[in-house]
């Protein structure tokens, strides 16, 4: 959409929190999703600049819009201007190494951005004929993920978990491992999460050289934040702003891009708030009636084309650990892989607390990953499943009442469970243990040795918080000498 040369000016007629009703001249109503701007001064003489997005046409030449920033200081009767186009954000190399808000304005206090090109945040998804369908595995260096829930290049992966089980830490580790190992660029969308986490992430990226603070355009990542303290309009649209930047790198620069979204649940939550403010009737559990459409509009744009790919890793907060809640349940339908985090494993001190039986991936097929990988993964899962079945018997009768074969299964399952833990680079400051990147070949070799019984003589503590199996063997020998 091209902005009209003739300025279309209306008047604010009502303000209810972040929702603004405006009246325009007859025949000049703005379109749905057009950006409206309000400029003026408040009662204290300070300059105001608020951007809104049209959501409803009310009749009587009035529209209802949702503000992307606070509406403090706005009054009825102020002029409101139709820009004639949707909200647009900067795209291209100028975005790298910088932090933007939902409107594409820099918020890192590093001066203006040299913007050469902008792109609207509302765009159609790529056509079916343009999509790339060849499945390729994406190595992350995290044992439990690479073995049991391999990620797809150009796929969508969800990190599901309740509060405090480690979603953001895993996401930061993936950024660290992949952005450093992977040649392409990344875009991080911080949707409705803690401001402190956003600040920590930025500083850690400078330390790990993912962001070059002296020459931002040499950086590997662009950051777009709409944090918890932002109005719901900003939190609802910041995911689209981040995605628009990622799409440019895919479609124009023809690169493989990584898109991190933390947290997709907050995107749904913001949509629910906006829906209520617009007066729509709520649906199941109080969510917006347009939940499926809202999630679909975002997810369908995250895909691989013949020009390049967007591999998306999305943290999904699970309210009250209930995976049947409409927000995580709707997100599930769009994903190629689900990494489910378990509070039970976190309480045992096993990090990353990935549930090896609850997590899934469409890539875990023999014709994609190969017979060796597939066989090892399934053997690990069946051993852990048998251990889970035996836990009730162990709790009532004790280990001694099990058969010799079952005792051996329990012993190996406990070693597998501990070997699925791993020290992270981003957690070094908390744990004091150096992080480890483990290749897929080393991961498969390690689990095969445990399953074959080659390491039955080692104590299970040797397998806890190590990288490769060679480290576990060395640690075991040291513990034996003790």
Curated annotation (Swiss-Prot):
It comes from the Bacteria. Keywords: ATP synthesis, ATP-binding, CF(1), Hydrogen ion transport, Ion transport, Membrane, Nucleotide-binding, Thylakoid, Translocase, Transport. It is an enzyme of class 7 (translocase). GO terms for cellular component: plasma membrane-derived thylakoid membrane; proton-transporting ATP synthase complex. Its main location: membrane. It is a peripheral membrane protein. Transmembrane segments: none annotated. Its EC number is 7.1.2.2. InterPro entries: AAA+_ATPase (IPR003593), ATP-synt_VA_C (IPR055190), ATP_synth_F1_bsu (IPR005722), ATPase_a/bsu_AS (IPR020003), ATPase_alpha/beta_chains (IPR050053), ATPase_F1/V1/A1_a/bsu_N (IPR004100), ATPase_F1/V1/A1_a/bsu_N_sf (IPR036121), ATPase_F1/V1/A1_a/bsu_nucl-bd (IPR000194). ATP binds at residues 161-168. It is found in: Cellular thylakoid membrane. It catalyses: ATP + H2O + 4 H(+)(in) = ADP + phosphate + 5 H(+)(out). The keyword Methyltransferase does not apply. F-type ATPases have 2 components, CF(1) - the catalytic core - and CF(0) - the membrane proton channel. CF(1) has five subunits: alpha(3), beta(3), gamma(1), delta(1), epsilon(1). CF(0) has four main subunits: a(1), b(1), b'(1) and c(9-12). Belongs to the ATPase alpha/beta chains family. Produces ATP from ADP in the presence of a proton gradient across the membrane. The catalytic sites are hosted primarily by the beta subunits. This is ATP synthase subunit beta.
